[in-house]
Amino acid sequence: MDRHRDFGKDRLRDKEFTEKLIKLNRTAKVVKGGRRFSFSALTVVGDQKGRVGFGFGKAGDVSEAIRKSVERAKRSMVLFPLKDGTIPHEVQAKFKGSLVLLRPACSGTGIIAGGTVRAIMEVAGATDVLSKSLGSNSAINVVRATFGAVAQLMDARKLARERGKALVDMWG
C-alpha cells in the first residue's frame, strides 16, 4: 500500500521538472564474439524557477542510461539566482579545458549561448542571458564549467543580509 502512495508522489514531482538530453554517446568494447555496445547519457534537469542539476549515466541500454542520468541530475540540484529572467551579474568559470562566460542581458534579448549552455539556461528558467564558451567544447566539461559559474552567482537578498545592508543600497 505504501509503495503505491510513494509512486504517486514521484509522478507528481516528475511533472514539475524539465529534462534535456545534452549528449548521448555509444561506446564499443571489442570482445571475442564481436562488439559489445554501451551507452552514456548527459542530461540537465530543472524546474524553470531557478533550480537546476546535471547527471551522467552509463548503461547497456539507451533508455536505462538516460534514466540513470536524470536520477542523478535530480539529486544534484542547485539553486540558480535569477533576477527578472537573467542572472544578477557577470561571471566566468573554468573547468579543465573549458571556460564559460555568462553575462546578464536586457529583457527581450533571449538566450544567446551554445547548445550545452543554452540547455542549462532553458531548464533553469533564464530567459535573457549572454554566454560564450571558450576552449574545449567537451559537453561534460562545459556543463561543469557552467555549474561552476552558477555557483559563483550571488543572490542580492542573501548578500545584503550577510553584509547587514539594505537591498536598495546593494543593487539599487
From Swiss-Prot:
One of the Pfam families matching this protein, by short name: Ribosomal_S5
GO cellular component terms attached to this protein's record: small ribosomal subunit
GO molecular function: rRNA binding; structural constituent of ribosome
Keywords of the record: Ribonucleoprotein, Ribosomal protein, RNA-binding, rRNA-binding
UniProt-listed GO biological process terms: translation
Domain S5 DRBM: 17-80
InterPro entries with a match to the protein in the record: Ribosomal_Su5_D2-typ_SF, Ribosomal_uS5, Ribosomal_uS5_bac-type, Ribosomal_uS5_C, Ribosomal_uS5_N, Ribosomal_uS5_N_CS, Ribsml_uS5_D2-typ_fold_subgr
Secretion signal, residue range per the UniProt entry: none
Domains as described in the record: The N-terminal domain interacts with the head of the 30S subunit; the C-terminal domain interacts with the body and contacts protein S4. The interaction surface between S4 and S5 is involved in control of translational fidelity.
Protein role: With S4 and S12 plays an important role in translational accuracy.
Recorded family membership: Belongs to the universal ribosomal protein uS5 family.
PANTHER family: MITOCHONDRIAL RIBOSOMAL PROTEIN S5
Binding partners and assembly: Part of the 30S ribosomal subunit. Contacts proteins S4 and S8.
Protein known as: Small ribosomal subunit protein uS5
Organism: Treponema pallidum (strain Nichols)
